[in-house]
């Protein structure tokens, strides 16, 4: 057992149990959320047992993520102290995991037992943990999380986090388009399975947490300030990029072309890498498309 010294006095305790593998999976999904912050509780994971379920959650004040798993036992809540360390410990638990909260106010201890393994760890009280933002949906949609995440990965290269224009700092959802633009280039994906009534913009780091949903259908709720992605067990809430002037896709991306041609993306990237290997790092090459040939010229040649 890994132990933390406590005072020897009679203490009331509350206990509940969960599946160890599900608890570890939930903690792992949340580990990317806690931020390096002078506010200690923002670096940790909150655990709340209510009725027949256990909800683990974390926030950095810009993004909130919670994962709910089945549980049985008493109702209680706490915030881990050193969540990263606890997550590593939970990796070795299998079967039924029992958690027991004991101790006096401001000096509570969580005891974790699983077979012949276990430990005692200090915890924070939940009153120090920020609450989720109040949310009233103005728009609601249903889509596949994996499809949306795939689109985000395809277009995020056109996001400019250093731009002073908010609309360039995130991924825009407009009609069927999931797209991004940063002044010099735009990227668009129409395979997200959405048809958005009122455009909204979300930062890439928040959208990358969609991976926790896997290949499942989710509900998307949107209002002026936030967007929530959720299913029965997982909820992800993020602030929309504030003060973003809605960009109109049709005004940014040309709708008519003088010429169109198709190519295999993998072959094109391979050919482009070959050409770029022939130039120096300080050169600024231009790629020329001419009658099926791909050539590269330097500005000073």
PLM segments and residue spans:
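Structural preference for solvent-exposed beta-strand-turn elements
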Residues: 2-298
């Amino acid at each position: 057992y890994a132990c933390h010294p406590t005072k020897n006095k009679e203490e009331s305790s509350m206990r509940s149990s969960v599946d160890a593998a599900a608890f570890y999976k939930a903690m792992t999904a949340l580990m990317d959320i806690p931020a390096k912050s002078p506010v200690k509780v923002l670096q940790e994971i909150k655990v709340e047992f209510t009725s027949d379920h256990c909800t683990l959650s974390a926030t950095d004040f810009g993004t909130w993520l919670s994962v709910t798993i089945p549980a049985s036992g008493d109702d209680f809540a706490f915030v881990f102290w050193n969540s990263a360390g606890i997550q590593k410990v939970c990796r070795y638990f299998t079967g039924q995991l029992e958690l027991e909260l004991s101790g006096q106010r401001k000096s509570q201890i969580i005891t974790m037992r699983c077979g012949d393994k276990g430990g005692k760890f200090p915890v924070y009280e939940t009153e120090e943990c920020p609450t989720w933002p109040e949310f009233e949906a103005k728009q609601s949609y249903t889509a596949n999380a994996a499809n949306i995440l795939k689109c985000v990965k395809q277009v995020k290269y056109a996001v400019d986090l250093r731009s002073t224009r908010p609309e360039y700092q995130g991924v825009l959802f407009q009609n069927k388009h999931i797209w991004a633009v940063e002044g010099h280039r735009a990227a668009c994906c129409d395979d997200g399975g959405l048809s958005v009534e009122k455009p909204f913009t979300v930062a890439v780091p928040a959208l990358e947490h969609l991976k926790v949903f896997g290949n499942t259908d989710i509900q998307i709720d949107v209002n002026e300030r936030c967007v929530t992605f959720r299913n029965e067990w997982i909820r992800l809430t993020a602030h929309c990029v504030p003060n973003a002037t809605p960009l109109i896709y049709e005004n940014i991306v040309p709708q008519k072309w003088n010429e169109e041609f198709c190519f295999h993306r993998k072959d094109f990237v391979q050919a482009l890498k070959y050409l770029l290997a022939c130039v120096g790092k300080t050169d600024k090459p231009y790629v020329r498309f001419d009658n099926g040939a791909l050539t590269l010229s330097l500005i000073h040649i």
